[in-house]
């Protein structure tokens, strides 16, 4: 039976938003998405290119509306806003700035806080429209206790403007819902990674940026080692033949990379695969009792840093990387390589020293008897994720002739 009205979605070019859009299109839904054009590509071209990466080839049911969440009225004319309000039955707000730097604070708040307010204003035009807001579990900030699904602002401090802005956005949604202006549900995924069945991922934030940085350094070292073996003695005496900060190739084909990473082995990161997040959100969204509730799409069994990092290093063929406390850098100064990593990975290092424990009882109850379960992060799971991504990096480097 065809659905009478369409879905309106923001953030269709993002990781989660593109997968949600793809699922709706596969289900035969009419989907209208808000997107910006770029310097070189139209809004529609950007959306279609992103959806093709997710496996979508038919766009008959897709309408792309050019606009911007950071602008009043989403940058749309009154006629277009009224048409959207009358032609859609659900609004999924996935768009967000993922930046975290303090110097970008104004832009982050413009996108994440003002943008949410502008989406709420659209939904208010026709009361009763269902608003689904995608937030993050990390609005819990620097808390180290159990973060409950019904909590928003409990006086916590934040690691960065991104977390704070997403918390502020939730407060806007919550206030509008309590006032009866919108009918809303909020979803808080944790660290979203690739598909649990294939390992495939289409956006490369978070832990993938860390892996890419490591992989690039290792490939550069292996290439230089190969060149050195084939070079004359005179050619190996200069900087090109020198080792990088104590790095060396081992007889077993692995690389020793003396790299200290600020973090704690016994702390965790909460990884959730994209398919679980999408399946879970859609299942929950169809439950009438989900109206007015917030859900942690998090892993009930978070992964210890002392488990995932060594397994990633094993697959990459590197030894010598270890998590240390701040005192280690007091006793032994930071190396050039460590300084480089700290600069590139500043955002992600914030999370290696501890995170809250996310209570997800609402999600577990809602998904009970549905067959939707979050997989545990095992050695096999990590191998699948890493295998796909390493193959992807190698193929991209080969096609682009990447200078390592």
Predicted features, each with a name:
Residues 217-224, 238-264, 328-373:
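A hydrophobic C-terminal alpha-helical subdomain
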Residues 195-207, 223, 284-295:
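Glycine/proline-rich active-site loop of Rossmann-fold NAD(P)-dependent oxidoreductases
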Residues 1-97, 126:
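N-terminal Rossmann/SDR dinucleotide-binding element
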Residues 280-347, 389, 393-404:
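Mid/C-terminal beta-alpha module of Rossmann-like enzyme folds, strongest
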Residues 157-190, 195:
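Active-site Tyr-X1-5-Lys
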Residues 102, 154, 198-199, 207-272, ...:
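A conserved pocket-lining segment of Rossmann-fold NAD(P)-dependent short-chain dehydrogenase/reductase
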Residues 90-95, 101-106, 110, 114-161, ...:
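Conserved Rossmann-fold NAD(P)-dependent oxidoreductase catalytic core, especially the SDR/UDP-sugar
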């Amino acid at each position: 039976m065809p659905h009478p009205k369409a879905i309106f979605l923001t953030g269709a070019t993002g990781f989660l938003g593109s997968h949600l859009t793809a699922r709706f299109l596969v289900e035969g839904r009419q989907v209208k998405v808000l997107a910006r054009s770029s310097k070189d590509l139209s809004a529609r071209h950007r959306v279609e290119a992103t959806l093709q990466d997710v496996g979508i080839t038919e766009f008959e049911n897709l309408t792309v509306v050019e606009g911007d969440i950071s602008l009043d009225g989403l940058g749309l004319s009154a006629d277009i806003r009224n048409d959207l309000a009358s032609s859609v039955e659900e609004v999924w707000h996935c768009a967000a700035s993922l930046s975290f730097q303090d110097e970008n604070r104004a832009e982050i708040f413009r996108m994440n806080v003002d943008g949410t307010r502008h989406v709420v204003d659209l939904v208010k035009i026709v009361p009763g429209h269902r608003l689904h807001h995608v937030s993050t579990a990390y609005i819990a900030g620097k808390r180290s206790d159990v973060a409950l699904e019904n909590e928003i602002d409990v006086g916590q401090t934040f690691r960065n403007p991104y977390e704070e802005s997403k918390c502020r956005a939730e407060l806007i949604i919550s206030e509008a819902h309590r006032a009866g202006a919108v009918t809303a549900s909020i979803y808080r995924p944790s660290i979203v990674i690739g598909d649990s069945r294939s390992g495939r991922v289409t956006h490369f934030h978070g832990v993938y940026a860390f892996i890419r940085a490591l992989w690039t350094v290792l490939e550069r070292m292996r290439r230089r080692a190969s060149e050195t073996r084939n070079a004359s003695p005179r050619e190996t005496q200069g900087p090109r033949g020198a080792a990088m900060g104590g790095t060396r190739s081992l007889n077993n084909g692995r690389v020793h990379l003396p790299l200290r990473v600020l973090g704690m082995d016994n702390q965790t990161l909460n990884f959730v695969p994209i398919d679980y997040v999408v399946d879970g959100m859609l299942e929950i969204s169809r439950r009438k009792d989900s109206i007015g509730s917030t859900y942690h799409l998090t892993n009930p069994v978070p992964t210890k840093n002392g488990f995932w990092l060594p397994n990633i290093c094993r697959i990459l063929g590197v030894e010598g990387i270890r998590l240390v406390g701040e005192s280690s850098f007091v006793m032994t100064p930071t190396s050039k390589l460590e300084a480089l990593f700290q600069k590139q990975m500043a955002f992600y290092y914030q999370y290696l020293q501890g995170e809250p424990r996310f209570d997800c009882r609402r999600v577990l109850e809602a998904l009970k008897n549905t067959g939707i379960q979050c997989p545990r992060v095992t050695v096999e799971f990590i191998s699948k994720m890493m295998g796909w991504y390493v193959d992807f990096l190698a193929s991209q480097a080969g096609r682009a002739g990447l200078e390592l």
